[in-house]
């Protein structure tokens, strides 16, 4: 989970893990749906999207413009591993584009990709294997 100016971004991998009754505050939470494993049923995701609208929760799809437009999501999340420059004419202009970056090079790429909000991660030293660098507070 990341926080940005009193907004909270929750990463989920399937629509069954979130209990909407636990979210009491409106217009502060955003869900980023990343489908890494088994693909979900579109009708189930549409129901999940509808619940997000009812609770005033922002709904973003990770790295999938087609799914983003099918579900009429609030926006697109571009992960740090996505290096492709987006063509804004290819999708609805009202979509918010957010992204994540792990270093200054990726930060520049996210700006080129049109991200309005960039989640800058790994600010502090961690003990993760193969991830020894950290940025510090910028």
Give the residues covered by each predicted segment.
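Conserved N-terminal beta1-alpha1 strand-loop-helix module at the mouth
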Residues: 1-84, 90-116
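Active-site/ligand-binding-proximal alpha/beta "capping" segment
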Residues: 113-138
């Amino acid at each position: 989970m990341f926080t940005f100016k009193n907004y909270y971004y929750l990463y989920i991998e399937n629509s069954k893990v979130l209990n909407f009754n636990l979210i009491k505050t409106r217009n502060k939470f955003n869900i980023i749906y990343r489908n890494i494993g088994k693909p979900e049923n579109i009708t189930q995701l549409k129901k999940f999207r509808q619940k997000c609208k009812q609770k005033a929760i922002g709904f973003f799809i990770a790295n999938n413009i087609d799914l983003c437009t099918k579900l009429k999501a609030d926006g697109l999340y571009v992960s740090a591993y996505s290096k492709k420059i987006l063509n804004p004419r290819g999708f609805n202009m009202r979509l918010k584009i957010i992204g994540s970056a792990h270093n200054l090079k990726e930060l520049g790429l996210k700006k080129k990709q049109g991200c309005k909000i960039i989640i800058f991660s790994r600010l502090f030293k961690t003990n993760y294997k193969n991830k020894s660098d950290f940025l510090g507070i910028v």
